[in-house]
Amino acid sequence: MLDAEVIAITGGAAGIGLAVAHAAIRAGARVALIDRDGACAQRAAAEFGAAAWGVGADVTDEAAITAAMAGAQRALGPLTGLVNNAGIAGFGSVHATEVETWSRIMAVNVTGTFLASKAALFGMLERGRGAIVNFGSVAGLVGIPTMAAYCAAKGAVVNLTRQMAADYSGRGIRVNVVCPGTVAGTDMGRQLLGTDCDPELEARRLAKYPMGRFGTPEDIAEAAVFLLSTKAAFVTGSVLAVDGGMTAI
C-alpha cells in the first residue's frame, strides 16, 4: 500500500503515532519519527532499523520543525506523506480555563499542525504529489463538557484540513483528517479516563460507544495508512471519525 513512500509522523515516538509508524512500515513505507522527546524518537527508530529515522523537535517551534523535516528528507528521501499526530488535551470550561492553558493547547494542536504542514508542503508542491493526514478528535465534531480549549483546537484542525484540501488537491496533494474517539492505552486516553482508571467513569464513557469498546492505537493507525495510500486516491477534504459510532448517536 505504501511501497517506497516516505512518511513523517509528528508525536511519533509513542501511542497512536508509534502505531501509525508500525502500520506504515508494514505497508512498505519508511518513516521519520518526530517527537518532542528526541531520545525516545531515536530509540523507537532504532528498533525499526533502516526503515525509520528519529529526531527531537517541538512542533510549535518553526525553526525546529523545519529542520526536522529537512533532516528526514536527507536521511530517507523526499517526503511523500505527513501525519500530524502531535497533540495535547486539557480540561476546563471557558470560565475556568487559564489563558496560558488555552494558548498552549492551541499552539500544539493548531499551530503545530500548521507549521509541520508548511515545512512538508514545499517539497510536495515541487514534486506535485503528497498526502497529509491531520489528527482531529471527536472533540472537534461535538461539544465535550469541560474541554473548551481542546474542542476549539480540534475543531480548528478539522476546518484547516478542509481549507488545505481546497488549496492543494488540484496540485496533487490530498489532505484528510482522522477524528478518533477515546483510545485506550495512550497518555490521552488515560487522561480522559482518569489516572486511577475509575470504573464508574470508564463505564459512563463506554456507554457512549455503540460498539461497546474504546478504540486502540491500531484502529486509528490503519485509518491513517488508508488515507495515506493510493487506495484513497479520490479522497480529500474528508473527515473520518474512527470512534466506534460515538458521534452517530
Curated annotation (Swiss-Prot):
The record marks 154 as: Lowers pKa of active site Tyr. The record marks 137 as: Transition state stabilizer. InterPro entries: NAD(P)-bd_dom_sf (IPR036291), Sc_DH/Rdtase_CS (IPR020904), SDR_fam (IPR002347). It is an enzyme of class 1 (oxidoreductase). Induction: By aliphatic and chlorinated alkenes. GO terms for molecular function: 2-(S)-hydroxypropyl-CoM dehydrogenase activity; nucleotide binding. Not inhibited by 2-(2-methyl-2-hydroxypropylthio)ethanesulfonate (M-HPC), an achiral analog of both R-HPC and S-HPC. Pathway: Alkene metabolism; propylene degradation. (S)-2-hydroxypropyl-coenzyme M binds at residues 137, 150, 182, 209. Its EC number is 1.1.1.269. PROSITE patterns: ADH_SHORT. Enantioselectivity is dictated largely by changes in Km. Is difficult to express due to its tendency to form inclusion bodies in heterologous expression systems. PANTHER family: 3-OXOACYL-[ACYL-CARRIER-PROTEIN] REDUCTASE, CHLOROPLASTIC, SHORT-CHAIN DEHYDROGENASES/REDUCTASES FAMILY MEMBER. Belongs to the short-chain dehydrogenases/reductases (SDR) family. Involved in aliphatic epoxide carboxylation. Catalyzes the reversible oxidation of (2S)-2-hydroxypropyl-coenzyme M (S-HPC) to 2-oxopropyl-coenzyme M (2-KPC). The enzyme is highly specific for the S enantiomers. This is 2-(S)-hydroxypropyl-CoM dehydrogenase 1. It comes from Xanthobacter autotrophicus (strain ATCC BAA-1158 / Py2). The gene is xecE1.
